[in-house]
């Protein structure tokens, strides 16, 4: 991972209203790094909203909170990861044209250089990550 990951971490409480705060946090960090914030804000919104909507009442080291981490890679891309305590692994859905949900990971897939999922040890949750090129 990149530089300063511990300094660029936000604990997100289980409330969809805080997604606006997530975007403010992303704007602050990307602004400090001289990066455009549109795509990072969009991807963070989708990943955090997905984590909050699908969170289970699970006990783990992080409790039920969602954690957003931002760092830079060696080639100056943005590494974004969202950690939650839910056991289920997300997957892209084939949303129809009238559906109001189900497009989050499709949006992430369109904008990220790459993205993926890794389960945490002892089945205490997962991390969904995305790498965004500097624009």
Predicted segments, located by residue:
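Conserved beta-strand-loop-beta-strand hairpin that lines the nucleotide-binding pocket
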Residues: 1-9, 52-135
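Bergerat-fold GHKL ATPase/HATPase_c domain
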Residues: 1-42
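Conserved ATP-binding N-box helix of the HATPase_c
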Residues: 37-61
């Amino acid at each position: 991972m990149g530089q300063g990951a511990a300094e660029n971490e936000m604990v997100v409480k289980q409330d969809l209203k805080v997604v606006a705060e997530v975007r403010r946090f992303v704007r602050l960090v990307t602004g400090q790094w001289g990066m455009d914030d549109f795509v990072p804000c969009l991807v963070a919104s989708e990943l955090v909203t997905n984590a909050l909507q699908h969170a289970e009442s699970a006990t783990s080291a992080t409790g039920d909170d969602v954690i957003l981490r931002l760092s830079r890679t060696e080639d100056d891309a943005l590494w974004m990861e969202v950690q939650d305590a839910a056991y289920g692994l997300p997957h892209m859905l084939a949303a129809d044209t009238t559906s109001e949900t189900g497009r989050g990971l499709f949006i992430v897939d369109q904008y990220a250089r790459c993205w993926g999922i890794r389960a945490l040890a002892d089945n205490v949750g997962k991390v969904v990550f995305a790498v965004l090129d500097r624009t």
